[in-house]
Structure formats: C-alpha cells, structure tokens
From Swiss-Prot:
Origin species: Nitratidesulfovibrio vulgaris (strain ATCC 29579 / DSM 644 / CCUG 34227 / NCIMB 8303 / VKM B-1760 / Hildenborough)
Any single GO CC term annotated in Swiss-Prot or TrEMBL for this entry: Holliday junction resolvase complex
Keyword annotations: Cytoplasm, DNA damage, DNA recombination, DNA repair, DNA-binding, Endonuclease, Hydrolase, Magnesium, Metal-binding, Nuclease
GO biological process: DNA recombination; DNA repair
Record's protein name: Crossover junction endodeoxyribonuclease RuvC
Length: 166
C-alpha cells in the first residue's frame, strides 16, 4: 500500500471546469490545491483546446496518481449534452496523455458519498467538502463538486482496501 495517494477530482464543463487536488496520507485527507478553468477562445474548438492546455498544466504541476471525473448527467437539451460530452472527453484525454488513470463517478454517487443523498444541492456538497477537509469553502461551486469527486474516490479506495479487495 502506498504511503500516500494524490487524486485530482474534475467536474467537466464547456464553460467552467472545476478541479481539486486531495491527498490522503495515513487516512487523513488534505486539500492540496483547487481551482476552475474558464476556457478562452473564439469558437468552441478553440475553447476545448484551451481547456486541454490548462488542465494538462494542472496535471503536470501536481502529478496526481489518479483522477476522479464526474460523469455526464442528463442535460436539458441534446446540444448541451454533446458539448458537455466533448468537454469531458478533453478532460479524460488530458489525464490519459499524462498517464493518470481516470475513474468515473455519477453525480448522484458523489453527492450520496458526501451528503448522504444523491439529490443534494451544490451548496450542501460544498459545505460537506469543507467539513471533510477542515477548510472554509470559498471556492466556486464547480470546484466544490470536483473536490467532492476526489473525496468520493478516496473513500471508495479506502472501503475497497478494508474489504480486502485491493
């Protein structure tokens, strides 16, 4: 078993992608860094390229062991779902290009792991992230969701170890 593990949680979006780095060492979770990427560029393809570059910079800077990525949920319309799926593909590609394994989690699974219900509001998730990490949540909602994904994954890893499955 590794002495510590570092996970990047990512909440993909075409307008804003939240990310958060959480490290677990000896059962203690620590916030390393977090932020939000607002891609720049004239057209959608340029924004996707900027998202890739910015996220790749984060991955290179923090060298996470694994990535927990929020899966695409149902969007209000097909065009929105397609754009979200493309942004998510860019996120997965940026991680894979740097050798970081990607684990997907449905939003309801992440919410249930942090709040106890899969229908929790973003504010509730952000509050619980702050409680778990022992910090005051002063980040964007997308960043809180990304940190929640990282915490959810670290909890899943711990449960797998305790069950003797890893």
């Amino acid at each position: 078993m590794a002495a510590s593990v570092t996970v990047i949680g990512i909440d993909p979006g075409s307008q804003c992608t939240g990310w958060g780095i959480v490290r677990e060492a000896s059962g203690v979770l620590t916030l390393v860094d977090c932020g939000a990427i607002r891609p720049k560029g004239g057209d959608f393809a340029a924004r996707l390229g900027d998202l890739y570059r910015q996220l790749a910079d984060v991955v290179r800077a923090h060298t996470p062991d694994e990535a927990a990525v929020e899966d695409v949920h149902a969007a209000q319309n097909v065009a929105t779902a397609l754009k979200l799926g493309q942004a998510r593909g860019v996120v997965v590609a940026a991680c894979a290009a740097h050798g970081v394994p990607v684990i997907d989690y449905r939003p309801s699974v992440i919410k249930k792991a942090l709040v106890g219900t899969g229908r929790a509001e973003k504010e509730q998730v952000g509050y619980m992230v702050g409680q778990v990490l022992g910090v005051r949540p002063d980040w964007k909602l997308d960043t809180g969701d990304a940190l929640a994904a990282a915490i959810c994954h670290l909890n899943q890893r711990r449960l797998t170890r305790l069950a003797g499955l890893a």
